[in-house]
């Protein structure tokens, strides 16, 4: 099971008393700000949660799994997430409790 944007909005509605429309808009604006920061090459740091970074990957050799043909995998930029210490600790504690 995965947490969706709709569920995040529902939580804002339930816990903070936002209207459903405002809750949905708040979630959309939050993620749009993260998208814009990453698109402009900025790192996103969410204290107590983790960091979103951009990483450049070099071109490398690859292989077509169907044909076995060697093909180059093109250079690209990827988004990475590194969880913060607090998030890591909370997740680790969940494992121990289960």
From Swiss-Prot:
GO terms for biological process: DNA recombination; positive regulation of metabolic process; regulation of DNA-templated transcription; regulation of translation. Gene3D superfamilies: IHF-like DNA-binding proteins (4.10.520.10). InterPro entries: Hist_DNA-bd (IPR000119), Histone-like_DNA-bd_CS (IPR020816), IHF-like_DNA-bd_dom_sf (IPR010992), IHF_alpha (IPR005684). SUPFAM superfamilies: IHF-like DNA-binding proteins. One of its GO terms (molecular function) is DNA binding. Residues 51-71 are annotated as: Disordered. GO terms for cellular component: cytosol. Residues 53-69 have a biased composition (Basic and acidic residues). Keywords: DNA recombination, DNA-binding, Transcription, Transcription regulation, Translation regulation. Belongs to the bacterial histone-like protein family. Heterodimer of an alpha and a beta chain. This protein is one of the two subunits of integration host factor, a specific DNA-binding protein that functions in genetic recombination as well as in transcriptional and translational control. This is Integration host factor subunit alpha.
């Amino acid at each position: 099971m995965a947490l969706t944007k709709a569920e995040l909005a529902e939580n804002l509605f339930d816990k903070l008393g936002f209207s459903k429309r405002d809750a949905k808009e708040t979630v959309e604006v939050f993620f749009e700000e993260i998208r814009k920061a990453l698109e402009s090459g900025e790192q996103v740091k969410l204290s107590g949660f983790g960091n979103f970074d951009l990483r450049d990957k070099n071109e490398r050799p690859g292989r077509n799994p169907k044909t076995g043909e060697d093909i180059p995998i093109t250079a690209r930029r990827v988004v990475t997430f590194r969880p913060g210490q607090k998030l890591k600790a909370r997740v680790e504690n969940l494992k121990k409790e289960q």
